[in-house]
Amino acid sequence: MIDVNNFEYMKIGLASPDKIRSWSYGEVKKPETINYRTLKPEKDGLFCERIFGPQKDWECHCGKYKRVRYKGVVCDRCGVEVTRAKVRRERMGHIELAAPVSHIWYFKGIPSRMGLVLDMSPRALEEVIYFASYVVTESGDTPLDKKQLLSEKEYRAYRDRYGSTFQAAMGAEAIKKLLQDIDLDKEVDFLKEELKTAQGQRRTRAIKRLEVLEAFRNSGNEPSWMILDVLPVIPPELRPMVQLDGGRFATSDLNDLYRRVINRNNRLKRLLDLGAPSIIVQNEKRMLQEAVDALIDNGRRGRPVTGPGNRPLKSLSHMLKGKQGRFRQNLLGKRVDYSGRSVIVVGPNLKMYQCGLPKEMALELFKPFVMKELVEKGLAHNIKSAKRKIERVQPEVWDVLESVIKEHPVLLNRAPTLHRLGIQAFEPTLVEGRAIRLHPLVCTAYNADFDGDQMAVHVPLSSEAQAEARLLMLAAQNILNPKDGKPVVTPSQDMVLGNYYLTLEREGAIGEGMVFKDANEALLAYQNGYVHLHTRVAVAASAVNNATFTEEQKSMLLLTTVGKLIFNEILPESFPYINEPTNSNLEKETPAKYFVEKGANIKEIIASREEVAPFSKKILGNIIAEVFKRFKITETSRMLDRMKNLGFKYSTKAGITVGVSDILVLGEKDEILHEAQAKVDNVIKQFRRGLITEEERYDRVISIWSNAKDVIQGKLMKSLNKRNPIFMMSDSGARGNASNFTQLAGMRGLMANPSGRIIELPIKSSFREGLTVLEYFISTHGARKGLADTALKTADSGYLTRRLVDVAQDVIVREDDCGTDRGLLIGAIKEGNEVIESLYDRLVGRFARKTVKHPETGEVLVAENQLITEDIAHIVENSGVETVNIRSAFTCNTRHGVCKKCYGRNLATGTDVEVGEAVGIIAAQSIGEPGTQLTMRTFHTGGVAGDDITQGLPRIQEIFEARNPKGQAVISEIDGVIAAINDVKDRQEVVVQGEVEARTYAIPYGARLKVIPGQKISHGKELTEGSIDPKELLKVTDITAVQEYLLREVQKVYRMQGVEIGDKHVEVMVRQMLRKVRVSDAGETDVLPGTLLDIHQFTDANAKVLLQGKQPATARPVLLGITKASLETDSFLSAASFQETTRVLTDAAIKGKRDELLGLKENVIIGKLVPAGTGMNRYRKVDLVKTTQDDMNVENDEVYVEQ
């Protein structure tokens, strides 16, 4: 079978009039659509069956031929071909225009392509095309210039003076004549000469013209094709007309627009035949031009054509643009069959890989499978009776459904799908009711809760799709978060609380110091009330089934609690017995202090020891990560299920509740508030005496109240009983934190007003005491602003993710090793003295570029190109090594992607990244998904200049869009020493003395200096506080410095908010922003100066001329913001579906661009498999080979080694 979708590239260009005629099946001559009485299409009209094909399958217009046997017959009465009705989706017609008409995209776009080709201004073009002025097309032997504009009056005067020696005309015909006269080769040569001398604006104009002319010359498009002689008419099914219930018709706007064109065209033909006066003809031509403009892009010029109710009509361009356009609505996202959605409820008894599917939904989703099975089992004679059985829901259907559903995973998706964990696969189990049951542990990944959330179900149909869902998407496989490689399935809320309660210790609990021969005996004692879960007891170590105990330890007693015995039973045997929440206990073994000799006085030893802290959420997360590291996926998911069950069971048994009596108001609160008030009064006194400024007074008042709140918070936390239910909830990490507590029992503290400025009157009451009316009113500001911000933030963050995905969607792991000799030198990221991201975090899962040696002993810690694991990273960090040279995406040489070595470990699996992994999209999701957690606006802590640097989401946008930052820092362009800091008028100037020259920098008013005289400074370093503009930095330094700066800044924003993201994700994005260069001098290559080129294209062009011994081109690297970078991509399909659709398509058509279909988006658009993952060619060409016994033996050996 021929594969329709197997084409290599897609090309777009201008259509010549002949090409348009060759597409067409006939000319549309009349504006009629459908006859209102017979409801049949009118002949030669917009829905004509003769042109576009029959309305009913195998039936001509007049009914002479019906049935499939006349296939291909053309009816002799009505001229309709007997064929399928769906040809009405593909057959085009055309309109022969009575006068040439300009295409608005090429005339009106920015820059005007027609204007660039003719070297005329868009204003002049508009005057000619819309019949306001004449243009000289042939000057003859008159003093007139070609392309000179003449008004009506001037034209008449010249006609009288020179007669017919010159030619001038109006409208698109005149422009067409000029376009036909142009000699591309001559113009291009002339412009290339001009470029050698031209400067400033003339140079930019010349570069733009050269680009367009070269495009026409290389693509084989004729410039005159920008003027239309023939207008194509799209197939009628794409602009349908449907009858509504009231007998009225609803029609697509395009039909109205086509009707206006046909009416005006026919009227113009008639006027020309009649030989009407030129002024009438001109007016009609202008109206035809406007009608065609409206059809192609309504509203681009002048007022849009409106339909009933003053609604602008949707033209052809609008059909492509925006979220509702063809690209984003129908090509990039389609609605699919075999899907359903319902409300979710919790399924606490499900296994990690299961979900509960409502019976009726499952029956509908798996209908075809059930039908096939019914027929195969002989329960139904044919498909039709099987279908009837299902529709009547007969009892035998359910048994068949059960068997069909086994081993057939389904996909569950929750919107918004912010990262790849928003769609996971589960094995369905049938449940009663109409709600989908979801495993509680996957809620974190979906960000789901059960307050009415809904989820969608999709069924993978083919066996390949099922296999992929099972192997790659099963919930039990997705334990780690792709953004940081930490477990994403940590228990939350009840589960945390239950495990916390289970591992509590309590001094003097019932039965303290009892000794048991094994865990069962201890449990028996607990069930009969002799001991409590929290009782500290001793158990014979030999009876605790743990492989990490030494022989000596096994002969001793283990001090623990009954709860911890229960808790440790969920862990694998070879895992240490966890008795205290410390890393050494987790990673190595149970500390020796918990083992005592048999016969020792157990009660005394226990009584002399402090209580050990219970296991909070963080510890549970560490346990999961450690288990995952040692035992891989299956064991981890089993352990998670056991942990979940324990948590639910014991949070139920604990019966932890919250009552008003649990909130005890602090006694010393009034005293602290009095002290603070006295300090505030003192500050106000100082201000009134003029000792301090208004700003200082404000800042001091704010800090006094903040400190008072902190003191209250500290004392409150100390005074709390460790058994206080609210404390237990917050301490375990189940719900709430210290600040909630302070607000309940201490004081609410300072609030911000709607503009973000902090109100200096604090709220002194707590919720327990109750607020005054004024305090309540002040509180509402903050609450309302919080809600408004959240709504805005979600939209902003979603748009950021969309732009990130778009710029990185074609970054795929393409090869094993690119063989680069460059690397990235990394150290810990610091802000002042605070470490934002440690060297350890940056090293794990990367390949070393150069050998790392111990600074003192010289011993090799990491060899070149070796993977740095957690253990190696610890050793490197502890050895005192400050910087390491690693392989990085920044320095990778792979085209259209990265290689395995430069990318390093895949964070989502903890193993090497596979060739075909779509790392670009994963990077975009990892950066975009936490976007909603970042704060929105800058907080103003009073008007201290320089402190208002942007943070949170706006800062991330600023970085990725490469905008000039707010509060920009001045940077030094040279290496040198700060020679002096001078005061000039009301500003300061910094003089930097280099080896050769001195530079003077004016410091903006209000900026704070970072340097002092005599200090050494290197180029690209800041002289003042603030953010550096990356574009400036690129001018002064090199690409590496800019890459490192952007990486550091992004990490700063996220880490400050407590969000961890792997460096490699940011690296992938930043690399995409720096992949273009701007050609400054073309040398002897055929690239054009001033154009943006991909680095690889540029090096290829240079390599070609260097081999011939010619002069290579030179270029500067360019930093593009992500929006700009997406639009500059080589793929026009990807760019057009992103933003500015018409501009991208206009440009691509003129250049005759080829889309090589390398990225993911382009392939989704044309309906091919994406070239990533199993869609890559190297995986598609796999053949099945019969295995022999020898192969089996080899494979078994390999498997054995891996264990």
Swiss-Prot record:
Pfam family, one: RNA_pol_Rpb1_1
Quaternary structure annotation from Swiss-Prot or TrEMBL: The RNAP catalytic core consists of 2 alpha, 1 beta, 1 beta' and 1 omega subunit. When a sigma factor is associated with the core the holoenzyme is formed, which can initiate transcription.
Protein purpose: DNA-dependent RNA polymerase catalyzes the transcription of DNA into RNA using the four ribonucleoside triphosphates as substrates.
GO molecular function, one term: DNA binding
Binding positions for Mg(2+) per the UniProt entry: D449, D451, D453
Cofactor binding: number and manner: Binds 1 Mg(2+) ion per subunit.
Main enzyme class: transferase
Keywords assigned: DNA-directed RNA polymerase, Magnesium, Metal-binding, Nucleotidyltransferase, Transcription, Transferase, Zinc
Superkingdom of origin organism: Bacteria
Keyword Nucleotide-binding: no
Claim: Transferase is one of the keywords in the record: yes
Protein name per the record: DNA-directed RNA polymerase subunit beta'
InterPro entries for this protein: DNA-dir_RpoC_beta_prime, DNA-dir_RpoC_beta_prime_bact, RNA_pol_asu, RNA_pol_N, RNA_pol_Rpb1_1, RNA_pol_Rpb1_3, RNA_pol_Rpb1_3_sf, RNA_pol_Rpb1_4
UniProt cofactor(s): Mg(2+); Zn(2+)
GO cellular component: DNA-directed RNA polymerase complex
SUPFAM superfamilies noted in UniProt: beta and beta-prime subunits of DNA dependent RNA-polymerase
SMART domains, alphabetized: RPOLA_N
